[in-house]
Amino acid sequence: MKTKIIVIVGPTAVGKTALSIEVAKRFNGQIISGDSQQVYRGLDIGTAKIRPEEQEGIPHHLLDVREVGESYSAYDFVTEAAQAIREIAAQDQLPIICGGTGLYIQSLLEGYHLGGSVPHEEILAYRAQLDSWSDEDLFRKIAELGIEIPQLNRRRAMRALEIAHLGGSLENSQPDYEALLICLDDERERLYERINHRVDLMLEAGLLEEARWLYEQAPISQASKGIGYKELFPYFEGRMSLEEAVDTLKQNTRRFAKRQLTWFRNRMSVTFYQVGNPDYKNQVMEDIKNFLDK
């Protein structure tokens, strides 16, 4: 029998963290972070990491599990998230994955384990290339390679081409989980306003000092490539004013939110919930209850 899990995804600043706490309290759950930057100790403000006092006693997993100079891959996430799911389920509690790193979460859910030898950037670059192809292009390539896929659709075709391209580096296995995928969304203008406001709050909370610490500790690390930090490095180097750096940070965060939504829409079988709908939380709770009662 497959383990049932809840997955809460969506663009940055849409309200995933707050909802995950409510779901965990309502359904006796524990939360697994699905964010590639929140694994790093010391990166709290720029990653919008939930603070201990905000956790309301709910256990959280995969926060602060790496030093900023260390690497972290989708393979690491799949391995460690699977272990956390087993531990939570063994306690008769509900595993809840919450985050916005689509590559990591998709890899876990679809039962494909990304070998550590495959560079993260290579996987992302090839997936971006496939995203730009039409359905006709994808299906033509599938036919050329002689790949047989039952119930062929865009998502299955892209996944099969990734496996072929990476030379079998993705080990195919059946997913171990039955997941309900919840994707939060909001009107573009309102989401972008929330992003801009969040950046302002981060700066007030000490983002500049946190980014400078990262710049001094590990300026060329994987952690330093995250949005929220790298945009401030030119300011530290005297190549950009603070105002210009902050404007770049806000712009990059808005673009990132757009890419996140594209990923979830094209890559994962999510159900969208509009946070502007005053009844959306009630609908989420009802859908989770029905899912768990099946």
Swiss-Prot record:
- UniProt GO MF annotations: ATP binding; tRNA dimethylallyltransferase activity
Question: Lineage of the source organism?
Answer: Bacteria, Bacillati, Bacillota, Bacilli, Lactobacillales
Assembly and partners are described as: Monomer.
Q: Which HAMAP family match?
A: IPP_trans
| PANTHER family, sorted | TRNA DIMETHYLALLYLTRANSFERASE (PTHR11088:SF60)
Q: Which domain of life is it from?
A: Bacteria
Q: What is this protein called?
A: tRNA dimethylallyltransferase
Annotated function? Catalyzes the transfer of a dimethylallyl group onto the adenine at position 37 in tRNAs that read codons beginning with uridine, leading to the formation of N6-(dimethylallyl)adenosine (i(6)A).
- InterPro entries in the record, alphabetically? Dimethylallyltransferase (IPR039657), IPT (IPR018022), P-loop_NTPase (IPR027417)
**Cited Pfam families:** IPPT
EC code: 2.5.1.75
Annotated region described as Interaction with substrate tRNA, given as residue ranges? 35-38
Give the record's keywords alphabetically: ATP-binding, Magnesium, Nucleotide-binding, Transferase, tRNA processing
Q: Which gene encodes it?
A: miaA
* The protein's required cofactors: Mg(2+)
Which positions are annotated as binding substrate? T12, A13, V14, G15, K16, T17
Family stated for the protein in its record? Belongs to the IPP transferase family.
- Looking at the UniProt record, the site noted as Interaction with substrate tRNA sits at T101, R127
Swiss-Prot/TrEMBL GO biological process terms: tRNA modification
- Residues the record lists as binding ATP: G10, P11, T12, A13, V14, G15, K16, T17
Q: Which reaction does it catalyse?
A: adenosine(37) in tRNA + dimethylallyl diphosphate = N(6)-dimethylallyladenosine(37) in tRNA + diphosphate
Q: What class of enzyme is it?
A: transferase
